[in-house]
Amino acid sequence: MKGDTKVINYLNKLLGNELVAINQYFLHARMFKNWGLKRLNDVEYHESIDEMKHADRYIERILFLEGLPNLQDLGKLNIGEDVEEMLRSDLALELDGAKNLREAIGYADSVHDYVSRDMMIEILRDEEGHIDWLETELDLIQKMGLQNYLQAQIREEG
């Protein structure tokens, strides 16, 4: 089914955001693991996998709309050098992605591509959940102090 060119462009932009997130979160997860921060490793690793699932959905939708998924134009990874910087980098990436999603959702709705819109709304819910988690973790660092926060990250999630 031939899709709206601008919807496909939005989907490719969102795909690019996901590809950056996959790599950034995966590297952050492994850095956390290397530092012995098991809980942060677990959460970041699962976020990386979630972003991969989002990317897969974008790729399938782009192909369905007879577009070509762009996996070559990757944005810049912002890899932090310490825990707080890493969480802030991830938050900035998520906030930018959510902004792009809202814009794309509005456009898809305006051209009556309700399937793309609904898919993006589902993904936005996931992204907002990750934003909330990141904001909470950064708030905990401020309230508890970094050393107490880090001590709490040694345990495994769950």
UniProtKB/Swiss-Prot annotation:
Catalytic activity annotation: 4 Fe(2+) + O2 + 4 H(+) = 4 Fe(3+) + 2 H2O; Fe(2+)(in) = Fe(2+)(out)
Domain of life of the source: Bacteria
Record EC number: 1.16.3.1
Annotated Ferritin-like diiron domain residues: 1-145
Enzyme class label: oxidoreductase
Residues noted as binding Fe cation 2 in the record, renumbered to the chain: 51, 94, 127, 130
Outcome of swapping residue 57 to K: In strain: ECOR 30
Mutagenesis / variant outcome for changing residue 52 to H/L: Loss of heme binding. Is still capable of accumulating iron
Effect listed in the UniProt record for changing residue 88 to Q: In strain: ECOR 30
Pfam families: Ferritin (PF00210)
Gene Ontology CC terms: cytosol; membrane
Cofactor(s) the protein needs: heme b; Fe cation
Binding site for Fe cation 3: 46, 50
InterPro entries named among the record's database cross-references: Bacterioferritin, Ferritin-like, Ferritin-like_diiron, Ferritin-like_SF, Ferritin_DPS_dom
Activity regulation: Iron oxidation is inhibited by Zn(2+), which binds at the ferroxidase center with a higher affinity that Fe(2+). The occupation of the ferroxidase center by Zn(2+) also severely restricts the ability of BFR to form an iron core.
Note describing how the cofactor binds: Binds 1 heme b (iron(II)-protoporphyrin IX) group per dimer. Binds 2 iron ions per subunit. The catalytic dinuclear iron-binding site within each subunit is known as the ferroxidase center. In BFR, the ferroxidase center appears to function as a true di-iron catalytic cofactor, rather than as a pore for the transfer of iron into the central cavity, as found for eukaryotic ferritins.
Binding of Fe cation 1, residues: 18, 51, 54, 127
Function: Iron-storage protein, whose ferroxidase center binds Fe(2+), oxidizes it using dioxygen to Fe(3+), and participates in the subsequent Fe(3+) oxide mineral core formation within the central cavity of the BFR protein shell. The mineralized iron core can contain as many as 2700 iron atoms/24-meric molecule.
Further remark: The internal surface iron site that binds iron 3 is important for the mineralization phase but not for Fe(2+) binding and oxidation at the ferroxidase center.
Self-association state and partner proteins as the record states: Homooligomer of 24 subunits, arranged as 12 dimers, that are packed together to form an approximately spherical molecule with a central cavity, in which large amounts of iron can be deposited as a ferric-oxy-hydroxide mineral core.
Family stated for the protein in its record: Belongs to the bacterioferritin family.
Record protein name field: Bacterioferritin
